[in-house]
UniProtKB/Swiss-Prot annotation:
Its C-terminal part seems to contain many membrane-spanning sided beta-sheets, that have the potential to adopt a transmembrane beta-barrel type structure. It is a multi-pass membrane protein. The gene is Samm50. PROSITE patterns: POTRA. One of its GO terms (cellular component) is mitochondrial outer membrane. GO terms for biological process: cristae formation; mitochondrial respiratory chain complex assembly; protein insertion into mitochondrial outer membrane. Residues 45-125 form the POTRA domain. Plays a crucial role in the maintenance of the structure of mitochondrial cristae and the proper assembly of the mitochondrial respiratory chain complexes. Required for the assembly of TOMM40 into the TOM complex. Keywords: Cytoplasm, Membrane, Methylation, Mitochondrion, Mitochondrion outer membrane, Transmembrane, Transmembrane beta strand. The modification N6-methyllysine is found at K255. Pfam families: Omp85. It is found in: Mitochondrion outer membrane; Cytoplasm; Mitochondrion. Belongs to the SAM50/omp85 family. This is Sorting and assembly machinery component 50 homolog. It comes from Rattus norvegicus (Rat).
Length: 469
C-alpha cells in the first residue's frame, strides 16, 4: 500500500499573537497511482491510529481534545479535511512552530483492509521566545518588545511580558493565559500592568497600576468576556497652563470594577470589511467591589457592511454610550467618553468635541456617533489584482454629539439634549489596508455643525488605527 501526504501550500506562522489564523489553505496531495486507485475503491475508511512525532513537554490530554474529530471520518476526503482542521487547531494553541500531517495505510496485525494511520509531525516552540514589532493604535504608533514562555506547564499555558513605547503612551505588563482543553475560545487570563499616558487635548497625564482577571467564552454565535479589574490611578497636569477643572481632578484614586463584553462579528475582515456585521456591547460596574470610584457605564458599537456593484461597498456604523455616577461624587475625567478625530467624527481634532474648560476637553457622560461610508476601487483600477487592491476611494458622512446629562430630567430630556448641537462632517479620501494589522486614511474633511469651543481640522486629515467610525 502507498502513502498519502497532505501539506499546506501556505507557510506556517512562527510567531505572533494570532496563532493558527491561516484562513482557507489549499491542500496539496501526492498519491502513488496504484495506492490512490486501491484506496479510493474502498468507499469507507477507518482511522485506526493517530500518532504524534516531536512531542516533548506537551501533555497528552490537551492533544487528544484537538484531534478527536479525526477518528470520526468515514472516507478519505473526510480524513484529509478533518486532519487539516485538527492541524489548524493545534497551530492555534500557540505551542507549535510547525505541524505537518502524514496519512498512511494501517500496518500491523490489527490492520483493517480499509484502515488508515494519521501522523502529526510537530515542532514545539522553544521554552523562551522574544519578539519585536510595531503597533498602530488609535491614531498612535508604538514599538513593542515582548518575552514569552509558551506551553509553560504543558497544556498551552502562556506567560508573557510586554513593554510598549508609543508617542502618547508607555506601558509594561505581565500576563498569564490558560485555555480550556478542547475549547480554545474558553480561556482564563490574569494581568499585571502599568500604563502611563499623555492626553494633550485635556492637558492631562494619567498613570495606571493595576491587576485584572478575565474569563472568555463563546455562547451560541456570540463571544463573551467577564472581567474584574482593580487599578490605582494617578492623575496629573501635563502642562502649567492646565485649566482649574483639570487641576482639581489631579490626585490618586482606586477603581475596582466588574465588566462584561459581548461581541457578534460576521465580517470577513476587521480592518476593511466588504460584508458582514458587528455588534459590541460593554457594561461596567465600579464601586461595589471596593475603591472610591462608583459608576455604571454602558456603550455599544454597531457596524453593517453591504457589497454593491462595481466592487463597491456601502458601510454604516453607530456608536453610543452613557455613564451614570453612583452616589454624590461626580464622574472622573478618566472615565468619561471622548469624541472627535480622524477615527471617529472626522473633520474635528482628536477628542476635541464637547464640554471644555479654558481649552482643555473634559469629556462627557453620554454620546452618540454615526457614519455612512462608500468604498470604491481607485479610478481606472491601477494595480488591479495586486498592490492596488489594498487601496480604496472613500466617501463619508459623519455625525455625533457628546454632552453631560442631568439624570433627574428623564429619558426624553436626555434624548432632546443629545439631539441638540449635532456636529457633522463630510468628505472624501483614500484608504490603505495594511494587511490585518491596521488601516490608514487620508481624507479631505469639511466640518459642519461646529459648536463654540470645538476644535476643527478643516481640510486634509490623516488617521491610523484599527477601530474607525
Amino acid at each position: 500500500m502507498g502513502t498519502v501526504h497532505a501539506r499546506s501550500l501556505e507557510p506556517l506562522p512562527s510567531s505572533g499573537t494570532d496563532f493558527g489564523a491561516l484562513g482557507e489553505e489549499a491542500e496539496f496531495v501526492e498519491v502513488e497511482p496504484e495506492a490512490k486507485q486501491e484506496i479510493l475503491e474502498n468507499k469507507d475508511v477507518v482511522v485506526q491510529h493517530v500518532h504524534f512525532d516531536g512531542l516533548e513537554r506537551t501533555k497528552d490530554d490537551i492533544i487528544i481534545c484537538e484531534i478527536g474529530e479525526v477518528f470520526k471520518a468515514k472516507n478519505l476526503i473526510e480524513v484529509m479535511r478533518r486532519s487539516h482542521e485538527a492541524r489548524e487547531k493545534l497551530l492555534r494553541l500557540g505551542i507549535f512552530r510547525q505541524v505537518d500531517v502524514l496519512i498512511d495505510t494501517c500496518h500491523g496485525e490489527d490492520a483493517l483492509p480499509n484502515g488508515l494511520d494519521v501522523t502529526f509531525e510537530v515542532t514545539e516552540l522553544r521554552r523562551l521566545t522574544g519578539s519585536y514589532n510595531t503597533m498602530v493604535g488609535n491614531n498612535e504608533g508604538s514599538m513593542v518588545l515582548g518575552l514569552k514562555l509558551p506551553n509553560l506547564l504543558g497544556r498551552a499555558e502562556k506567560v508573557t511580558f510586554q513593554f510598549s513605547y508609543g508617542t502618547k503612551e508607555t506601558s509594561y505588563g505581565l500576563s498569564f493565559f490558560k485555555p480550556q482543553p478542547g475549547n480554545f475560545e474558553k480561556n482564563f487570563s490574569v494581568n499585571l500592568y502599568k500604563v502611563t499616558g499623555q492626553f494633550p487635548w485635556s492637558s492631562l497625564r494619567e498613570t495606571d497600576r493595576g491587576v485584572s482577571a478575565e474569563y472568555s467564552f463563546p455562547l451560541c454565535k456570540t463571544s463573551h468576556t467577564v472581567k474584574w479589574e482593580g487599578v490605582w490611578r494617578e492623575l496629573g497636569c501635563l502642562a502649567r497652563t492646565a485649566s482649574f477643572a483639570v487641576r482639581k481632578e489631579s490626585g490618586h484614586s482606586l477603581k475596582s470594577s466588574l465588566s462584561h463584553a459581548m461581541v457578534i462579528d460576521s465580517r470577513n475582515s476587521s480592518i476593511l470589511p466588504r460584508r458582514g456585521a458587528l455588534l459590541k456591547v460593554n457594561q461596567e460596574l465600579a464601586g461595589y467591589t471596593g475603591g472610591d470610584v462608583s459608576f455604571i457605564k454602558e456603550d455599544f458599537e454597531l457596524q453593517l457592511n453591504k457589497p454593491l456593484v462595481l466592487d463597491s461597498v456601502f458601510s454604516t456604523s453607530l456608536w453610543g454610550g452613557m455613564l451614570v455616577p453612583i452616589g454624590d461624587k461626580l464622574s472622573s475625567i478618566a472615565d468619561r467618553f471622548y469624541l472627535g478625530g480622524p477615527t471617529s467624527v472626522r473633520g474635528f481634532s482628536m477628542h476635541s468635541i464637547g464640554p471644555q474648560s479654558e481649552g482643555d476637553y473634559l469629556g462627557g457622560e453620554a454620546y452618540w456617533a454615526g457614519g455612512l461610508h462608500l468604498y470604491t476601487p481607485l479610478p481606472f483600477r491601477p494595480g488591479q489584482g495586486g498592490f492596488g487592491e489594498l487601496f480604496r476611494t472613500h466617501f463619508f458622512l459623519n455625525a455625533g454629539n457628546l454632552c453631560n446629562l442631568n439624570y433627574g430630567e428623564g429619558p426624553r430630556a436626555h434624548i432632546r439634549k443629545l439631539a441638540e448641537c449635532i456636529r457633522w462632517s463630510y468628505g472624501a479620501g483614500i484608504v490603505l489596508r495594511l494587511g490585518n494589522i491596521a488601516r490608514l486614511e487620508l481624507n479631505y474633511c469639511i466640518p459642519m455643525g461646529v459648536q463654540r469651543g470645538d476644535r476643527i481640522c478643516d481640510g486634509v486629515q490623516f488617521g491610523a488605527g484599527i477601530r474607525f467610525l
